[in-house]
Swiss-Prot record:
Family as reported in the entry's similarity comment: Belongs to the MEMO1 family.
InterPro entries reported in the protein's UniProt record: MEMO1_fam
Organism for this UniProt entry: Methanocaldococcus jannaschii (strain ATCC 43067 / DSM 2661 / JAL-1 / JCM 10045 / NBRC 100440)
NCBIfam families on file: AmmeMemoSam_B (TIGR04336), PRK00782.1 (NF001987)
Protein name: MEMO1 family protein MJ0403
Length: 287
């Protein structure tokens, strides 16, 4: 019997009632900080990498919606797309790098893991363990799923996921994980999307946060994962998911990606009006 991973932050980070959740996702798309358009029907042509924030939808949902709007233009429902979602481990539970199989439940329906991809990953990449403990209370991957499920409900795409939770975010680990994501995607001939779930600077004044965030955004747009790691360390940037972003960039470059584009940037202060201690949010696409 398949393991079921139940939502940990439904009713906290996003509504737990399906109708309210759909309304909120639609509001994120149409918000002044969002793409101001609903998702569209597109065509899958090549691997896609995305940077997505993972705070409560009221704070970062409109920025997050930019990534899913661009994704909608680059996927279709003709066959399933495997979405590898890399998130940091905020709980301190579980293994250093943890992948999980089974089913992830959302208020909008279940999302299945790509079991074959998951098995190949933990068997071939020594740093990755098959471990559900890290995932049970972790929000960074979970908050991406309602946006994916919403695209399915619109018949824009069909998805399976590979959820990877990273407590270890050192450069060598992140690059190795990224390399194996690309290697297995090629071996299994998967349609592939790689999402790095990360917020940027945490709880600093707007002026400082925006300057620090500009540094890491520049590194991401230059697809320079080594520089990103060094800047996070040297400038003491409190970006929670730099490891997932490094892994995403490595995977995408290995899969032939050539360019990255910033889709949107804002801080929690732009939403709340309190600029004294903000969190930075960005969406970007790599292809």
């Amino acid at each position: 019997m398949n393991k079921i991973r139940y939502p940990a932050v439904a009713g906290l980070f996003y509504p737990s009632h399906p109708d309210e959740l759909i309304d909120m996702i639609e509001q994120c798309y149409l918000h002044k900080f969002g793409p101001k358009s609903m998702p569209v029907h597109g065509t899958y042509e090549k691997p896609i990498g995305l940077l997505c924030p993972h705070a409560g939808y009221v704070y970062s949902g409109p920025i997050q919606a930019h990534s899913y709007y661009e994704l909608s233009k680059r996927v279709d429902a003709l066959e399933e797309t495997t979405v590898v979602i890399l998130g940091p481990n905020h709980t301190g539970l579980g293994s250093g790098v943890s992948v999980m199989d089974g089913i992830w439940r959302t208020p909008l329906g279940d999302v299945k893991c790509d079991e074959e991809f998951v098995e190949e990953l933990w068997r071939k990449c020594e740093i990755v363990d098959l471990d559900e403990t890290a995932h049970l209370n972790e929000h960074s991957i979970e908050v991406q799923l309602p946006f994916l499920k919403h695209l399915e409900l619109l018949n824009i795409a069909k998805f399976k996921i590979v959820p990877i939770c990273m407590m270890f975010q050192d450069y060598e680990t992140a690059v190795e994980v990224g390399y194996f994501i690309a290697k297995i995607a090629k071996e299994l001939n998967r349609r592939i999307v790689v999402i790095a779930s990360s917020d940027l600077t945490h709880y600093e004044p707007q002026e400082i946060a925006s300057k620090k965030d500009a540094i890491v955004i520049k590194d991401i747009l230059e697809m320079n994962e080594k520089e990103l790691y060094e800047d996070v360390v040297n400038y003491n940037i409190s970006m929670c998911g730099y490891g997932p972003v490094i892994a995403m960039l490595k995977a995408m470059k290995t899969l032939g990606a050539e360019k990255a584009k910033l889709l949107a940037y804002a801080t929690s202060g732009d939403i709340t009006g309190d600029y004294s201690a903000v969190v930075g949010y960005a969406s970007a696409i790599v292809e």
